[in-house]
Amino acid sequence: MDFIEISLIFREHLPLLELCSVIINLLLFLVFLFAVSARQILVCVRRGRDRLSKDDTVSASNLSLEREVNHVSVGFGFNLSLLCCLYVLGVQVLVLVYDGVKVRREVSDWFVLCFPASQSLAWFVLSFLVLHLKYKSSEKLPFLVRIWWFLAFSICLCTMYVDGRRLAIEGWSRCSSHVVANLAVTPALGFLCFLAWRGVSGIQVTRSSSDLQEPLLVEEEAACLKVTPYSTAGLVSLITLSWLDPLLSAGSKRPLELKDIPLLAPRDRAKSSYKVLKSNWKRCKSENPSKPPSLARAIMKSFWKEAACNAVFAGLNTLVSYVGPYLISYFVDYLGGKEIFPHEGYVLAGIFFTSKLIETVTTRQWYMGVDILGMHVRSALTAMVYRKGLKLSSIAKQNHTSGEIVNYMAVDVQRIGDYSWYLHDIWMLPMQIVLALAILYKSVGIAAVATLVATIISILVTIPLAKVQEDYQDKLMTAKDERMRKTSECLRNMRVLKLQAWEDRYRVRLEEMREEEYGWLRKALYSQAFVTFIFWSSPIFVAAVTFATSIFLGTQLTAGGVLSALATFRILQEPLRNFPDLVSMMAQTKVSLDRISGFLQEEELQEDATVVIPRGLSNIAIEIKDGVFCWDPFSSRPTLSGIQMKVEKGMRVAVCGTVGSGKSSFISCILGEIPKISGEVRICGTTGYVSQSAWIQSGNIEENILFGSPMEKTKYKNVIQACSLKKDIELFSHGDQTIIGERGINLSGGQKQRVQLARALYQDADIYLLDDPFSALDAHTGSDLFRDYILSALAEKTVVFVTHQVEFLPAADLILVLKEGRIIQSGKYDDLLQAGTDFKALVSAHHEAIEAMDIPSPSSEDSDENPIRDSLVLHNPKSDVFENDIETLAKEVQEGGSASDLKAIKEKKKKAKRSRKKQLVQEEERVKGKVSMKVYLSYMGAAYKGALIPLIILAQAAFQFLQIASNWWMAWANPQTEGDESKVDPTLLLIVYTALAFGSSVFIFVRAALVATFGLAAAQKLFLNMLRSVFRAPMSFFDSTPAGRILNRVSIDQSVVDLDIPFRLGGFASTTIQLCGIVAVMTNVTWQVFLLVVPVAVACFWMQKYYMASSRELVRIVSIQKSPIIHLFGESIAGAATIRGFGQEKRFIKRNLYLLDCFVRPFFCSIAAIEWLCLRMELLSTLVFAFCMVLLVSFPHGTIDPSMAGLAVTYGLNLNGRLSRWILSFCKLENKIISIERIYQYSQIVGEAPAIIEDFRPPSSWPATGTIELVDVKVRYAENLPTVLHGVSCVFPGGKKIGIVGRTGSGKSTLIQALFRLIEPTAGKITIDNIDISQIGLHDLRSRLGIIPQDPTLFEGTIRANLDPLEEHSDDKIWEALDKSQLGDVVRGKDLKLDSPVLENGDNWSVGQRQLVSLGRALLKQAKILVLDEATASVDTATDNLIQKIIRTEFEDCTVCTIAHRIPTVIDSDLVLVLSDGRVAEFDTPARLLEDKSSMFLKLVTEYSSRSTGIPEL
């Protein structure tokens, strides 16, 4: 080639560059005008909408009074950027004037003025935009400006390059005004390009605020008062996702918190989605009651508009994705010298660029849309499942345990939401096949029919796989449900497991359940590996069939046609790959839909079980006519039968009877909780319910008492007084703001009951239903509470109370005596005594117990003093619950306060925040910043010490090499144009291609199998490590950690590790190697591309780092915000009866919706951030592709091989997708790795002492005598909490019966926990038979001790398994224990005897029966030391007396420590320990203590005796 030809080339290219510049400037200018117009239209529309709806913004009551004072400082960078814009504008205006004069003088073509005119117009607009930034106080450069500056500099460099080559060839005589202008503006454009890369305008805005800006009455500390900018974003902002810039900017400077994340737009909130789905679900149920309703249909009806909008983007994206494959043959022909029209190459390059640009934008909008659609579906379904959980009938609860329902929310709902990604594949697959066939028909002719046949065969092959995967998924989910159910049960009852030394046994059971789950997981993952093989093999099979058919038919294959076909196959690969995934996902989604649909169709509580009449319309408060009720409607024996009762307004009704007589069921029938077989129940007014097993919410004491009602200080103070809580609250370190642990773990049994009573009293109901609330209280507190609460505070209310305290019965207006589910006696106290029979037997047993106590009269001089009460009055002014709180103070300020008052609010809020740090339950720990490399290494080393990682990379590299080799072979071997001969024999061509391509698919199968093997081993190891760590955790961990947090890790996080992370890791390796292959192919043809790839890669890494700073924190917040949803659900299910009893369902549903929004807020920003990054990645890669195309077109014909250039274009079509997918796969991998990080946290819990210490194992006969010695024992629950036991010292002689008494909260149960080492003493020591228990293993200690705990616990299973979980005893021994514990006849009356079922939490057994089962366990264990912690509180006096006799007989030679509020239970003990405020007040024989007139024990006995003589003396 000579200089003349080169000169002609550059003469052609320079005008084209100028033409490109003109077109780009005009396009950007039009976009600018369109954006401005669209923004104005959107503003007008929103103004009109705002007038019609108040819902689109946060209400004024929720907004702060903030008036920000913005201080704007203009930096040197801004001034220089404005100066550069004006400078370039001036230069272009000069060029325009010069060229205009020249044209006029020389009478030239006016077309030459287009370039300087467009440049002048563009830089005028740019100067205006930059100047406008100052008035907008914008710290960030608009995306449009940044793109404009970047393109201007790029075109300038290209023009300078062409100008330089031309001047070198033709000489300086050809120098023009444009050349001079380019040289003049290059430094300015370079600086502007640098600013475009940084994105900073040079303007700094300092926002300051006065005290008047402090938000008032913000309920949640984590609340944000700003609605997401997404709701008001303009068209350009929506397309470019620049509305997210402020959040990402904040995240790049500091770790994001929930308060940084804006509120959702009203249309995106859970409430909106829930209402729509709920309405359509009801409609589907009512349309055809005879057929099961379709949940899928209800979902489609609810969200079809969003799906249709997504379909538009999906369809457009599909169309433009086939533009490249269609044009490749033309491009190869052009490079081969076949030019159809002038400048065809540039036109083709422009079309390629435009199509990829449209594909990029539509892809991001499409993916963003499906994410939002899935988000709405998940929110709505979660809310539906929660609501259903509150309404479940007793029968339905047996079919769905809380663990299973957690799985519905955590796994099934997630899967249904994820199906939005596959929703459009159903109709897109045929569309893509049709487009592919059209292109193939152009390329290979009639052989395209073979493509269709091969495609159909490939699809049919996947159908059996889908069925197999559906079965595997169904079995996997069933196994996961079972594991979650047992895990949830173990976490709830961990205290019992540790006390009984059963934790290893139950942990092994969980490991066995995991093994079963692991088996199905292994099958699912290996089947997925086979699906991956099918995915990569299908296009190879289709291509081989197509090419073989073409060769057989004699169709001429050309390089262009082959490359077009290969590009088409590569695109067709996606729907072919997605089809197995689609079928698999449809199968999985169907399973999840069926599970949730079945749950939503479960029977709810009978709405007509109780007829509620508004207050004031009747004098009859409660009326039951011919009531027959049964927990199991299919049972032949009803729970309650023949119930007749009429209670007038204001009456006090007492319900009594022996254990299992139906007392609690009687309360349930009034509430409508128990299924009604026949009869009628009517109540007049509202109800307040206090359950027998206290239900306490996590939160502070005030929140538990208010229970959603507004604070009224006087009323609140009276309630505290009436419930005897004032002294307790004063003793708490934070008063009524003390955080209560899960299930009230840091409260004593009596305190929990009094909080329950306070909650009921504060609601001011008309009817109060109290299920034995006094059993957990000592005599004095019980007497005071009965007097102040029932006789005084509820004097004008209707009260129905269940009680075993016979002494309270005389105060009742009506007494009901139940036996075997029937009311056998009813009437007043005296009338029933005279009638004799069962009621007289109950009362007589009580009086006999009282008469057995020989009680001297206390001296009159001490009668008005109470040393125990005085010792408890340790007033803490900081915990005064009656001072004005933050809300009251804020209200006063709103009514006319000053700034100083607001400062007081701020200070008080700061103090409250500081005080929370000392609470028992803390906010969930969250790692901040970059995921530690230690986490990655721990995961990669978890399976075979990382030995599989190199093999996975090697297999992927081999696959990629063979893929490129097969495509290169087809491009090289086929002729460039029709008529030319092929370089090889057609048969050899096909054999080599098939061998290379099939070999690549084999390697991908090897990679997929290795990834599955690696993932399985790593997941199993991580799970077992976490499980063992959790089970070895001290009890303080469970006290301070809500079960929802742990369940979140063993369900959601573990599912991510099981099913997601292995493929994420493999996908990242795959994408990395594929990207390297694409770049290698492109640079092999046009090495100049590498010069642009390097800066683009740097820019990508910078953006990835910028994005990850916010993304990882958003993912962590998402994970943390999921726990409260699960926790609330578990808590609500446990207290559903209480919630319904107070009619609080709507409030709890609203709370659930709020928590869902708190979860969705960071999730929404997280998915938007992903699309934000992908958009910018793909735009950069599209520019690289465009640059490659321009270079290929610029080369003279014959310079490069058209076949290789076509191959480079074929791979370049995938560059934008692969580059963004590479960065995205790493980002998603890091986001998913956070699940491993969270599991790793729980694998590193500091465990309690070893279970067995081989060097200090006690003798097998230990303890021989059972002597317990406490030496200066001090105990506290946590380092940040006060001491509970203050130097307790005493000796319990072996074989003696020790009674432990004291006021509620005096430290009795804490002492027992120290004995079992659930809490390790901070000082002192405890010895048993002269062996320091701190020196031996926990299992050796706890397995040698027996206990009947205060809260009786039954595990789901059978009676046999609950009595003998370790399977150490024969049936005869078990029956003997049941008979001695008074349960033998009850169990014999069951159809399955010892195999009689026990439901979750033992719900089908009464509380009293559960305590008797605990007694049976102790009888079987026959430990030398037995502890009874309020073991008989929930049984009647006669049964209690009988149990005490059994214990005295069966444990005659054992040391028995009894904690009891019933004085007769401990009066015959050998020694009595009186505790007061965590100290030993008295310790002696009962006789000596009763002889001492100043004895605290004497006062306790006297109080009990006085109370037991009857209510009139109270």
Curated annotation (Swiss-Prot):
Residues the record lists as binding ATP 1: G657, T658, V659, G660, S661, G662, K663, S664
Coiled coil region boundaries: 899-927
Sequence intervals crossing the membrane: 16-36, 76-96, 111-131, 142-162, 177-197, 312-332, 334-354, 421-441, 446-466, 533-553, 946-966, 986-1006, 1078-1098, 1117-1137, 1155-1175, 1180-1200
Cysteine disulfide partners in this protein: none
Keywords from the UniProt entry: ATP-binding, Coiled coil, Membrane, Nucleotide-binding, Repeat, Translocase, Transmembrane, Transmembrane helix, Transport
Short name of any one Pfam family annotated for the protein: ABC_tran
Name the record gives this protein: ABC transporter C family member 5
Annotated source species: Arabidopsis thaliana (Mouse-ear cress)
Organismal lineage: Eukaryota, Viridiplantae, Streptophyta, Embryophyta, Tracheophyta
Encoding gene per record: ABCC5
